[in-house]
Design a protein with these regions (language model features):
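Short hydrophobic alpha-helices and adjacent helix-cap/hinge residues
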Residues: 2-11, 18-19, 24-322
Length: 322
């Protein structure tokens, strides 16, 4: 474990309300539903488990931590939600918007904690971030889309068009594209859209978009994230750089990315789960945007495209891949 991640776990444990010995003597049942497996969401899940471990929970002893993935299929997410609710765990955790929505729709009684959800209000998970009134609260990973556009502009000063591939069936993706359009308009930049309803469609959509755009923006869309290699391959074939909304896209060939450390997001989510296990009501746990973001640069990917990364970006980057 990296030192920064270990520090995040320790810090989260120190800041959280101490878990009582009597509470830890019982087995806490936590059921996690994740829409699809990809590096960012997997990191969030790992951070969640490590965060709980740092608070004194041990899998197989005083913690029953269950996990299922919907393999990118919202219908499977609904099935998982129904199964979990029937098992009556102490806390349900939905990783990403579709899984969180499925859990929230399946119960009004079992506490639901969401994480890695772009727009909790738009997704109808909560009506008010500051004052959740039902059985649902958690963490948003709303991307700083305006900063992503500024990042693309810094990399390509003469930028006139940004391409984006997304799944219109994901509420989070629709929100991000709307924010992208607003930010791009302020810079006089045209947005070229390509849609992909499933992972298998991402590369073909990217092939079309890449030939019409100066850069491709890869949002924190779960469909795109699960097929990021195909998107980057299509972009590279057209000599079009990729800017990522998640730093998890950097190893796949994104030239630059600004986004959350999803492991840290998971650790922060553990605070919510532990609070519920300690008996705190959902109404006392405001939903909020996760803390912390990183700028990462893939200089090797840039060089393959004949791009020189500005020193201003390199100086600010917390991670550089050569």
């Amino acid at each position: 474990m990296k030192a920064s991640k270990l520090a995040a776990v320790v810090c989260a444990a120190a800041l959280s309300v101490g878990t009582t010995t009597s509470t830890l003597a019982e087995t806490a049942r936590v059921a996690v539903s994740q829409i699809v497996e990809h590096p960012a969401l997997d990191a969030a899940r790992n951070g969640l488990l490590d965060g709980l471990i740092a608070k004194g929970y041990t899998q197989g002893e005083n913690l029953d931590f269950k996990y299922q993935t919907a393999q990118g299929n919202p219908a499977i997410a609904v099935q998982i939600a129904r199964q979990y609710v029937g098992e009556q765990p102490d806390v349900l955790v939905g990783i990403a918007t579709p899984s969180a929505q499925a859990l929230a729709a399946a119960t009004r009684d079992v506490p639901v904690i969401f994480t890695a959800v772009t727009d909790p209000v738009g997704a109808k998970l909560v009506k008010n971030m500051d004052a959740p009134s039902g059985n649902v609260t958690g963490l948003s990973d709303l991307s700083p889309v305006a900063q992503h556009v500024a990042l693309a502009k810094e990399l390509l000063p003469n930028l006139s068009s940004i391409g984006v591939v997304y799944n219109p069936g994901e509420a989070n993706a629709v929100t991000l594209v709307e924010l992208l359009k607003e930010a791009a308009e302020q810079h006089g930049i045209k947005v070229i859209e390509g849609t992909a309803l499933k992972s298998a469609d991402v590369q073909s959509a990217a092939q079309v978009v890449a030939t019409q755009s100066d850069v491709i923006y890869a949002p924190t869309d779960n469909t795109v994230a699960s097929a990021i290699d195909g998107l980057v391959a299509a972009a590279n074939a057209a000599d079009t750089p990729v800017i990522g909304g998640s730093t998890s896209y950097i190893p796949n060939g994104a030239v630059a990315a600004l986004g959350f450390d999803y492991y840290s997001v998971g650790v922060q989510t553990a605070d919510y789960v532990a609070a519920v296990l300690e008996g705190k009501p959902i109404s006392s746990l405001p939903a909020k945007v996760a803390e912390g973001s990183d700028l990462a640069v893939n200089r090797a990917a840039a060089e393959k495209l004949g791009l020189e990364v500005p020193a201003s970006l390199l100086d600010r980057a917390s991670r550089i891949v050569d």
